[in-house]
A protein has these predicted regions:
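DNA target-recognition domains and sequence-specific DNA-contacting regions of bacterial/archaeal
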Residues: 1-104
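Amphipathic alpha-helical coiled-coil/heptad-repeat segments
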Residues: 102-134
């Protein structure tokens, strides 16, 4: 967590939020940088999540940093989390009450890779069509 919110575009390390703004600034702080990558950042209040593959710092303890182990593809988990929104009307921390109990179906590793490849192929086609329409 950053000690100071004295951000500057001159600094090197991005400070992240899992929400819409994503990079909220840059810090010159060198301690506590998350550099065991890739990770998924998860906002405990909004349930937004993002896959991150570059070193960063966080602004708030309301953001969880998630890693995979063994034969679990992080892209597969990130895509699964992006379509799974367990959000209600109350302002609460959703990680402990909801998401930590979520059972994610984990197919064999090669199937995870196939699913990710299919999703990315579809997204690339959508981007290509959108660009052609612009």
């Amino acid at each position: 967590i950053v000690n100071s919110t004295d951000y500057s575009d001159e600094y090197e390390t991005p400070v992240l939020t899992a929400g819409k703004s994503f990079i909220i600034g840059y810090t010159n702080e060198t301690n506590g940088i998350c550099d065991r990558l890739p990770v998924i950042i998860f906002d405990d209040f909004t349930t937004d999540s993002k896959l991150v593959d570059f070193p960063f710092k966080v602004k708030s303890s309301a953001m969880k940093i998630l890693r995979t182990k063994g034969e679990i593809n992080i892209d597969y988990i990130a895509y699964y989390m992006s379509i799974t929104r367990l959000i209600g009307d109350t302002h609460k921390r959703y990680w402990i009450s909801e998401y930590s109990k979520l059972l994610i179906p984990i197919p064999p590793y090669q199937e995870q890779l196939r699913i990710v490849d299919t999703i990315e192929t579809i997204f690339n086609e959508i981007l290509k069509i959108t660009a052609e329409l612009s």
